[in-house]
């Protein structure tokens, strides 16, 4: 049986402390290919600047998770974001979520999604995201289906494939 993990979830924006930003960047890179790789901390800053709603998870002064989300009408140049922009008038798009491997299976991802879901409900928005199907991310697909998401499409790219989900 796993021990309980004490953690706190905090909202953040582009003005986040550089130490926290650095930890988020390294956690992102540790979680590729489940999340897209970023070439630099500056790329992460630009991503956050374009985003709408973001949270990080901290335990014992260490960032152990994060989620970055966008609303409609962003200038974000992601093909996956553009898919939902064409499909939905208003939406909340989860661009990336990452949990440190050591802290998975403690409900942290679910709690981040519950925060996002609360915002979506308050604003009458669907939550949209994509999950890799090549390379296959079975755990994330199961997580999203268990959380009530339905697959609404898929896309093949030159180096990977994704399934699109909506709740």
Give each language-model segment a name.
Residues 68-96:
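Conserved acyl-donor/pantetheine-binding loop and adjacent beta-alpha core of acyl/acetyltransferases
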Residues 52-71:
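Conserved beta-hairpin
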Residues 120-133:
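Conserved GNAT acetyl-CoA-binding A-motif
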Residues 4-7, 154-167:
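C-terminal "cap" of GNAT-fold acetyltransferases
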